[in-house]
C-alpha cells in the first residue's frame, strides 16, 4: 500500500480549508484517510502561525514508515524543517521561445533598415 501525505479539501464554497492527512495513494482526494497530521487554512494571512498547523511527531513517524508527501505538502514540511525539498534547475526558463526570437530578429531588421536609408 503506497501512502501519501496530502491535502483533503474541506470548507464551504469559495472558502477552502485543507486537512493534511495520511492516505492510500489510490483513495479519492476527499475520501478515506488513515491519520490526520495537520491543517492548512489558505484564507488566513501568510504570516499567521495558525495558517499551517503540523503535528511534527506524527509526520516524522509516517515519513519513517515510507509515506511520500505531495509537492504542496513537501513545501510545508520544508518550511517547518521536517523534510528537505530538492531544488529544481531549469536553465532554459529565462530564454525566450522560438517565436519571440523570430519577432526580435524582425524588429532588429526593421530598425536597421531606416537607419541605412537615413545614412544614404
Curated annotation (Swiss-Prot):
GO terms for biological process: translation. This is Small ribosomal subunit protein bS16. Residues 95-110 have a biased composition (Basic and acidic residues). GO terms for cellular component: cytoplasm; small ribosomal subunit. Keywords: Ribonucleoprotein, Ribosomal protein. One of its GO terms (molecular function) is structural constituent of ribosome. It comes from Methylorubrum extorquens (strain PA1) (Methylobacterium extorquens). Residues 81-120 are annotated as: Disordered. Belongs to the bacterial ribosomal protein bS16 family. InterPro entries: Ribosomal_bS16, Ribosomal_bS16_CS, Ribosomal_bS16_dom_sf. Residues 111-120 have a biased composition (Low complexity).
Amino acid at each position: 500500500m503506497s501512502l501519501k501525505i496530502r491535502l483533503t479539501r474541506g470548507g464551504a464554497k469559495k472558502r477552502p480549508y485543507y486537512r493534511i492527512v495520511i492516505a492510500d495513494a489510490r483513495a479519492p482526494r476527499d475520501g478515506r484517510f488513515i491519520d490526520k497530521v495537520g491543517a492548512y487554512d489558505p484564507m488566513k494571512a501568510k504570516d499567521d502561525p495558525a495558517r499551517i498547523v503540523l503535528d511534527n511527531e506524527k509526520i516524522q513517524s509516517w515519513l519513517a514508515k515510507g509515506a511520500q508527501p505531495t509537492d504542496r505538502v513537501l513545501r510545508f514540511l520544508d518550511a517547518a524543517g521536517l523534510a528537505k525539498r530538492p531544488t529544481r534547475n531549469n536553465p532554459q526558463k529565462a530564454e525566450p521561445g522560438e517565436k519571440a526570437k523570430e519577432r526580435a530578429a524582425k524588429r532588429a531588421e526593421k530598425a536597421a533598415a531606416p537607419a541605412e536609408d537615413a545614412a544614404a
